[in-house]
Amino acid sequence: YQSTAPADPTPLNEAWANAMRDVVAQFPNDPHILALGADALMNLHPWDFWLADGTSQPWTTEITDLIEAALEIDPDNIGAIHLYIHAVEASTTPERAEPYADKLADLSPNAGHLVHMPAHIYLRVGRYHDSTLNNMKATDADSWFTGVCRSNSFIYLGGYIPHNWHFGATTAAIEGWQAQANLLADGTKNAITPQMLSMAGFTGNAQQFVAQPLFVDVRFSAWDDILAEPEPAMDLLFLRSIWHYARGRAFEGKGDLAQAKDELAKLDTLRLSDETRAMKSVGRNSIDAVLEIASLTLNGEILSSEARYDEAIPLLIKGVAIEDSLIYTEPPDWFHPVRHSLGEAQLAVGDASAAESTYVTDLKKWPENGWALAGLKEAYMAQGEAEEANKVQERLNEAWVNADVPMPTSGGIPFAESAPKMELTER
């Protein structure tokens, strides 16, 4: 430990991890020691325990072995459960942490972050409604904590609190619960102060949080709400880029392709500017990658509306590839799976087999999400596979049980009047 943090903490982290290995060897039956040992090892490789294909990194097994040993001794160990969720959420078997995730919120009901934590597993296993509910409870716990403790911790106020709102908005949107997604997206935006938006090194994350209502409105085809949004301040480059993206989607959705193309041009000019690219990152990914996905998606949607599918589909395939290459984080740094737009275009051009493959792959990433199930059902119907389509319809019925909007088609829900925006006090 050093009172002044060094520019490179690696030597200190390595010394601490080696010291904790020695302590674990002395106290192998103490679950707290085992959890602290795992935590020390995790800090050597933060958020880097699994490759994109789910293969474990060379150091991962030592970490999970320590945590599992701690949980074998004490299945209710809060620290070990917290670490276990983070250690396996990006794996191909996140469900192994599910029994522990199910109990964590009740073990620590006043700690907002821990109440929220099960959502990291629920998102991966398709329990979107449970994720939404946990994050709603987490925001209540956060409100209690800040009221009692009057916390002025920037990390807590600017990171953990909006993260819970953001996560809940994401899963509410996946499950088709528009009113709650609106509420949670607004809460995400409202958690960010002007000071956070102007803070060097944090402005990208802050702007991503503030953009959440736009992303949710795109998901639910709330085109009029998007077009009613005022232009963000000139210095909020990522937020302005997403504003142009959302407006482009809205104009395209309403059939005004000339205006949609104008918004695409403005998006491209802004995202390729030196000032925007100097922001470097948003969330855990490069701003270049995230905004290129926005451009490719909007362009692909416009071209699809013009029935220029031979041009649209390659752009959407490129968007999928970039989306798949993004560094893992939850919620993902790109809100709308590009595969949903790609599958819709493939169906429109008559390539139902390719659309089936697209939606099946999406469902592997986001299990039982209703948006992809709707597309998969259409793909089976287009291929004359009525029995398979009926099976998927049953799954879609279950996936949409908590929704407050009509069942989606492959491209989303039909454009309609927006769901009413609830006040936060109505939760």
Regions found by a protein language model. Name each.
Residues 30-33, 76-78, 111, 145, ...:
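Residue-level recognition of tetratricopeptide repeat
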